[in-house]
Design a protein with these regions (language model features):
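Short, flexible, surface-exposed loop segments at domain boundaries
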Residues: 1-26, 47-91
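SH3/SH3-like beta-barrel fold
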Residues: 27-31
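Beta-strand/loop nucleic-acid-binding surfaces
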Residues: 34-51
Length: 91
């Protein structure tokens, strides 16, 4: 798998709600400058299988080569999500 097309977004989970199908969730993340929605599916890798919760600081990666709907706030398919502790960074 080529990771060079992956983009990282760091922010805090504001809400988690059911997605369009039984096996997806929509996570709204507030970054320093905007809100971003991520679709989390069974194909999304969550590091250490951490249970995602509201208020949790995360880094989410999405593939910029995949199509994304032209909506606001932006909505991406999350490929990988990891939780972050205070002042922790990931590259």
């Amino acid at each position: 798998m080529v990771y060079s097309s992956y983009q990282k977004i760091i922010g805090t989970i504001q809400s988690i709600r059911s997605g369009n199908s039984c096996c997806t969730q929509m996570i709204s993340v507030r970054t320093e400058s905007e809100m971003v929605d991520f679709v989390v599916s069974q194909d999304t890798e969550v590091i250490d299988n951490v249970r995602l919760r509201r208020g949790m600081r995360i880094a989410a990666f999405y593939d910029t080569n995949l199509p994304a709907p032209a909506v606001f706030p932006p909505q991406y398919q999350a490929e990988l999500i990891t939780s972050l502790r205070r002042n922790q960074e990931v590259t």
